From Swiss-Prot:
Residues that coordinate or bind isopentenyl diphosphate: 41, 74, 124, 225-227, 269
Protein name: 4-hydroxy-3-methylbut-2-enyl diphosphate reductase
Superkingdom field: Bacteria
The species this protein was found in: Salmonella schwarzengrund (strain CVM19633)
Cofactor dependence: [4Fe-4S] cluster
Residues binding dimethylallyl diphosphate, per UniProt: 41, 74, 124, 225-227, 269
Keyword Iron on entry: yes
């Protein structure tokens, strides 16, 4: 059995930054550190940080006065931000800068009185945070997930209308929704640069290349990870058997026993140690040395807040 690895895969710059913010805050201030929502959608990462003293909460009211609070990489609404400001809390923002970019687009539209349409998945924390940037009562903010949603949508003023997208969507699906928006609302204005982030786009491109060669594709990522789900869906659309797994223990030998080639990738919130464990598991089932495919080089780095820019080893 051949083992192929997608490239790129795993952690993106936004996830790296968010985890570093929590780790550095724990090192500097000590436990407990409160984090609103899972800092990233990965069970291994969240469990590891929880063991070190991070407490994951959903409501600001759960945080005691005087505590350290961190917003997750998915971002928060203005209402949540204002609630935190009203409390005696030290707040650090781990929102991915590429999510913040979309927040700024929504806030700008709100100030101008333009109505805005967000392409995204209902209930996802990034969507809730992005929708929560719009505050103009004279306008409106709408959520669509599919072309069908677009055709049933009614807005107040088609002449002052813009759209944005969640950063972790399927590139292909989003293109279909944008096409529908432009047909339904010919004057609609989109972002100058695509809101789907570089990491999402690159990982979907990489899984396409992987699925062209592999019989079975394993995507390392948690069930609540939007970008990981999109990778598994893409491989399945290409006619491959694909499984979304949290870790190597999820793999069943029956999945791969007849496969000549198994492809492995990982969502943007999945650490490389999980991929290495998957490789080891596949080798138990007769897999050979893992071969990494050629792919796009990623060298983007997002800095942590200056208050947390320390060598963690100095405070251990």
């Amino acid at each position: 059995m051949q083992i192929l690895l997608a490239n790129p895969r795993g952690f993106c710059a936004g996830v790296d930054r968010a985890i570093s913010i929590v780790e550095n805050a724990l090192a500097i201030y000590g436990a407990p550190i409160y984090v609103r929502h899972e800092v990233v959608h990965n069970r291994y990462v969240v469990d590891s940080l929880r063991k070190r003293g991070a407490i994951f909460i959903e409501q600001i009211s759960e945080v005691p006065d005087g505590a350290i609070l961190i917003f997750s990489a998915h971002g928060v609404s203005q209402a949540v931000r204002n609630e935190a400001k009203s409390r005696d809390l030290t707040v650090f923002d781990a929102t991915c800068p590429l999510v913040t970019k979309v927040h700024m687009e929504v806030a700008r539209a709100s100030r101008r009185g333009e109505e805005s349409i967000l392409i995204g998945h209902a209930g996802h924390p990034e969507v809730e945070g992005t929708m929560g940037q719009y505050s103009n009562p004279e306008g409106g903010m709408y959520l669509v997930e599919s072309p069908e949603d677009v055709w049933t949508l009614n807005v107040k003023n088609e002449g002052k209308l813009s759209f944005m997208t969640q950063t972790t969507l399927s590139v292909d699906d989003t293109s279909d929704v944008i096409d529908a928006l432009r047909k339904r609302f010919p004057k609609i204005v989109g972002p100058r640069k695509d809101d789907i982030c570089y990491a999402t786009t690159n990982r979907q491109e990489a899984v396409r290349a992987l699925a062209e060669q592999a019989d079975v594709v394993l995507v390392v990522g948690s069930k609540n990870s939007s970008n990981s789900n999109r990778l598994a869906e893409l491989a399945q659309r290409m006619g491959r058997t694909a499984f979304l797994i949290d870790d190597a223990t999820d793999i069943q030998e029956a999945w791969v026993k007849d496969a000549a080639c198994v492809g492995v990738t990982a969502g943007a919130s999945a650490p490389d140690i999980l991929v290495q464990n998957v490789i080891a598991r596949l080798r138990e089932f007769g897999g050979g040395e893992a071969v990494t495919l050629e792919g796009r080089e990623e060298n983007i780095v997002f800095e942590v807040p200056k208050e947390l820019r320390v060598d963690v080893r100095e405070v251990e």
